[in-house]
Design a protein with these regions (language model features):
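A glycine- and small-residue-enriched flexible loop/hinge signal that marks low-structured segments
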Residues: 43-233
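Surface-exposed interaction regions enriched in Ser/Thr/Asp/Glu
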Residues: 1-43
């Protein structure tokens, strides 16, 4: 091997070794393997979620958010995430941040029924809809929610007492999986957030996260259980 590969910040660097013969070469041949993501199944993701138990032993960190963007739209995967979240190693609690499928739910009025019918109703779930975009890139909203929660926690000395709701998010729009724009008025966003207990985004003079309820709401009205910020403390 004449080179080594490593990441630095957001860049992938290829560095020739000191004794490499490639310094004098006119052409370089670089070989690599590419993961075939098409072979991943929902069952693979479910098995991966089970290994969250090993995080403390392997890296010395216990996750407090479990996220599987692109897969938590499968109700079975979401259920496994929620089942694992409340008791990691029998000691630690987390929240499963899950997405509602925008291929099926393409309008805000369908959110509550789909959520209820498909079991996204756990106090260990932060349920999210729709997708979001930044420029030409589409993201599952759970990615944005996890990032914002982590930032808010970090700003508060890693104490999770503050809600992520009504905090700015760096996106340029809300969309469904097919790219269709989702434009919500404040009352419509409240139908998703307050009536359905689902976290969404709202453009009200700037994009913000909108919603502070866990999946168990509105069935549960216990303040200690239904709010993201009180339940996580």
């Amino acid at each position: 091997t004449d080179y080594e590969v490593y990441y630095t910040d957001n860049a992938l660097c290829i560095e020739l070794l000191a004794d490499s013969s490639s310094y004098s070469a006119d052409k370089l041949k670089i070989g690599y393997d590419v993961a075939d993501l098409s072979t991943i199944t929902a069952e693979d993701v479910e098995m991966a979620v089970e290994t969250v138990e090993m995080c403390r032993s392997v890296v010395g960190i216990v996750p407090d958010l479990i996220c599987a963007p692109g897969w938590s739209t499968d109700p079975t995967v979401a259920a496994v995430m929620a089942a694992k979240a409340p008791s990691i190693n029998g000691l630690f609690r987390a929240k499963a941040v899950v997405d509602i499928n925008t291929k099926t739910v393409n309008d805000y009025s369908k959110v509550l029924k789909y959520k209820t019918d498909n079991g996204y109703v756990s106090e260990d779930m932060i349920v999210c809809w729709p997708m979001v975009k930044s420029g030409d890139y589409l993201f599952n909203i759970s990615v944005i929610v996890c990032g914002l929660i982590a930032k808010v926690d970090s700003d508060n000395a890693d104490c999770p007492y503050e809600s992520p709701s009504n905090k700015s998010v760096s996106i340029t729009g809300a969309v469904c999986a097919d790219g269709t724009e989702v434009t919500l008025s404040l009352p419509q966003a409240d139908v998703i957030s307050v009536s359905a207990g689902v976290v969404t985004v709202l453009n009200n003079g700037g994009w913000t996260l909108w919603g502070n309820y866990l999946g168990c709401y509105p069935k549960t009205s216990d303040v200690a259980k239904m709010f993201i910020c009180t339940n996580r403390v």
